[in-house]
């Protein structure tokens, strides 16, 4: 062993012991003939003092610079009174260095690693990720990630789950996003697909009698990136047999409660369970942030006969929605703020943002301030009564197709909640349940809200007769407005699976071509089963307070799915393409 202790693990318990440390020079200071080195390793920092009484060590220390890799042997002693550092685990002690060996020198890093206040571009950090990881902030996040996965494994092991690996090279199946395709050299002209999830394989494991499965799985989706999306991501994938949806939610809730309690010291009460219809009605989102105490109120029925077309049109449209958002005590918002909110909802397709300021409600219309009151005067007081408006409030309105209203007003609710500091608590977990089985596309076809293997609450006959009315036995875990996990019970009979494919417009021939292995499995006695998948990266992001999942992944991709460190993706040699039977088509040149 080259070392006896980690730098960050030294405490007063080691006083008067001789220790050997290995690590990097975090910071070097020369004070009046005494050299101080802050030594850093994975566990933290410790101060090393080298004085002229050890001439050889002092001469070596005089030449070292930041990020040199050193091996230091010395004696642990208590710091002099007044020089302690309460911000460090090792802040009560220091190491009096006796021997120093330079294991590796370092050039000056492209950005400082010992100053968290330096503003470094993300692309620069990713290009030199091997250096960025040395920063204590990044090391802490990766260490925390390891603790999370270790606790999850232990929890699932204790509850009888088996860790089973599923294939990375598989075939393309319709799961919503584009697949990453891998050409086969042996089967020329054919392609593997990297898995978007282990969904079908974990269902087959249940048919195989595994009973309880889990895997911390790599998944791949070729989709547009956002702050919480990556082309490759990690999923805590879980499947069980002979449990109902309540059992699965209780099991996964228990795991989440344990994570937050043991790693953050946060104790959760029983998670609320909210139907999808309630979430959309009150919060215009299927992942509501319950820390914000604002709710939407439907008012379309009051607008049926108004002459104001902005409201009358959506009120009479079966696919329209008019929703009011009352913000208590915000009637003093300046016009500039309202204009900014109007621009904000425009991002989501809203054509404007109507509002009413309630100054003195007892004066009726005269006590209101709004450019729209004159158009809805006959029903305005009834409207304000429905939303519970009081003096000093402002009420915003969204009127359009339901999707536009939900997207715009749901986002506005969250933005206003944060802008006006209305957040009532630090954490608000819940389950959203009773999702629709299908949603209608613009061309009148049905598509799965989750995936085509989700079990409906309806019978086969009802699914065929009224697919739009079918609810699924699906459940999403939502934390602070972010979906951290989602799952469902699965279809386990051939008859129901064929009925769902039929509703989705998947012919028998297409089903056999793409899913013959699943349909075959359902012919041989599949158990009732269901599961869930957590987005590990997203969960770690929330628990650490990181602003992006890129900050909790060792080697992430950029928003354009590139790796600045390795320059991936990159062109390949012509002979490699020839072996795969691939010829690249020349792309038209972009005009200047």
UniProtKB/Swiss-Prot annotation:
Key word Ribonucleoprotein present: no
GO cellular component: cytoplasm
Sections of the chain in a coiled coil: none
Binding site for ATP: 221-223, 230, 483, 535-538
Subcellular location: Cytoplasm
Swiss-Prot/TrEMBL catalytic activity: tRNA(Asx) + L-aspartate + ATP = L-aspartyl-tRNA(Asx) + AMP + diphosphate
Residues annotated as site: Important for tRNA non-discrimination: 31, 82
GO biological process terms, semicolon-separated: aspartyl-tRNA aminoacylation
EC number of this enzyme: 6.1.1.23
Enzyme class: ligase
Keywords: Aminoacyl-tRNA synthetase, ATP-binding, Cytoplasm, Ligase, Nucleotide-binding, Protein biosynthesis
Matching InterPro entries: Aa-tRNA-synt_II, aa-tRNA-synth_II, aa-tRNA-synth_II/BPL/LPL, Asp-tRNA-ligase_1, Asp-tRNA-ligase_1_N, Asp/Asn-tRNA-synth_IIb, AspRS_core, GAD-like_sf
GO function term, MF aspect, one: aspartate-tRNA(Asn) ligase activity
Annotated residues for binding of L-aspartate: 175, 221, 450, 490
Major location category of this protein: cytoplasm
Similarity comment: family membership: Belongs to the class-II aminoacyl-tRNA synthetase family. Type 1 subfamily.
PANTHER family recorded: ASPARTATE--TRNA LIGASE, MITOCHONDRIAL, ASPARTYL/LYSYL-TRNA SYNTHETASE
Record note on quaternary structure: Homodimer.
Protein name (record): Aspartate--tRNA(Asp/Asn) ligase
Organism for this UniProt entry: Acinetobacter baylyi (strain ATCC 33305 / BD413 / ADP1)
Gene name as annotated: aspS
